[in-house]
Amino acid sequence: MLKPLGDRVVLKVEEKEQTVGGFVLAGSAQEKTKTAQVVATGQGVRTLNGDLVAPSVKTGDRVLVEAHAGLDVKDGDEKYIIVGEANILAIIEE
């Protein structure tokens, strides 16, 4: 399993029509974003005074992420993307 560092997040992209709260996203929104599930998170980032700021997302969250963000990676037969937390636009609450 991949363990991201810092503020990076490992995502499993959902390969289906995107909906948010039961609403289908418009075609233009689907081209700019994708829906994914958080598989793993880094420990967070440190502030200048050394405090650790934990990620805003957690394993299992469904998120909306910028379509072209991140790096495509494979772990065995599974495909994932690794993004910085700043590339995650929203947590999808059901």
Curated annotation (Swiss-Prot):
An example Gene Ontology biological process: chaperone cofactor-dependent protein refolding
Gene Ontology CC terms, in alphabetical order: cytoplasm
Keyword Isomerase: no
Superkingdom, taxonomy of origin: Bacteria
Subcellular location: Cytoplasm
Entries under InterPro entries matching the protein: Chaperonin_GroES, Chaperonin_GroES_sf, Chaprnonin_Cpn10_CS, GroES-like_sf
Primary localization class, coarse: cytoplasm
GO molecular function: ATP binding; metal ion binding; protein folding chaperone; protein-folding chaperone binding; unfolded protein binding
The entry's keywords: Chaperone, Cytoplasm
CDD domains for the chain: cpn10
Subunit-level organization: Heptamer of 7 subunits arranged in a ring. Interacts with the chaperonin GroEL.
Homology family: Belongs to the GroES chaperonin family.
Role played: Together with the chaperonin GroEL, plays an essential role in assisting protein folding. The GroEL-GroES system forms a nano-cage that allows encapsulation of the non-native substrate proteins and provides a physical environment optimized to promote and accelerate protein folding. GroES binds to the apical surface of the GroEL ring, thereby capping the opening of the GroEL channel.
Name of the molecule in the record: Co-chaperonin GroES
Species classification: Bacteria, Bacillati, Bacillota, Bacilli, Lactobacillales
